[in-house]
Regions:
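Extended terminal accessory/targeting regions
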Residues: 1-143
Length: 143
């Protein structure tokens, strides 16, 4: 789980990088964002693996922060699912460009990782996208 310090740092980076969709973070308190954000990778990753991925890809952490908030408020539709994953890629490109000059190879590595991770989410993330939506429907007696 993220600390309050992590949440504040990630929110500031979302602003610094001018990431798309960051306004969704305003729908949560900082305490709620602590539990919503699980880092880069699926919830099924063990903590040590997610920690490793986050350490190796710090530029993509604010991108995943927005992505996790979107998934927590999932509407369960394929259209929104695809839009969230496409936004992950675009935001990853923005973060890479903001953090690394065009002459730095790291910029292109981060951009490629953003593309790959967005594609992984699109290919393998449907059940994780649906889970919060289905839980809300069940809690409201709609299922």
């Amino acid at each position: 789980m993220a600390t309050l310090k992590d949440v504040k740092r990630l929110k500031a980076l979302c602003e610094k990088y001018d990431l798309e969709g960051r306004e969704i973070l305003d729908k949560f308190t900082n305490t709620e964002l602590q539990s919503v954000y699980n880092g880069i990778g699926p919830e099924s990753f063990p903590d040590w693996l997610r920690g490793l991925v986050n350490t190796l890809h710090p530029t993509l952490e604010p991108v995943a922060f927005i992505h996790d908030a979107e998934w927590a408020l999932s509407d369960g539709t394929e259209t929104s699912f695809a839009a969230s994953n496409a936004r992950f890629k675009r935001n990853g490109y923005k973060a890479a460009k903001a953090e690394f000059g065009w002459w730095r190879p790291r910029r292109y590595l981060v951009m490629n990782d953003a593309r790959r991770y967005g594609n992984y989410c699109q290919l393998f993330g449907w059940s994780a996208w649906r889970a919060p939506y289905d839980e809300r429907r069940k809690a409201n007696g709609q299922v």
